[in-house]
């Protein structure tokens, strides 16, 4: 299993959260297995995927980029991946 971490700053947590929750169907369709977020304004989200390739494809998807813009993400996110051992 691969976990993708995404950290970014948002201009307004409430706006970001609404968009994040509305994006749930696309997340699941792209292979997201779990999710969490906390600390308004400085967001770290984790998503679990079956493998690295699926996680990387989701991270590069146009749907994710569009959703982040609409949600008020400020600047480029920091994204990294881990594998369970």
Regions found by a protein language model. Give the residues of each.
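Short S/T/G/P-rich N-terminal loop/turn motif that feeds into the first structured element of a domain
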Residues: 1-67, 73-85
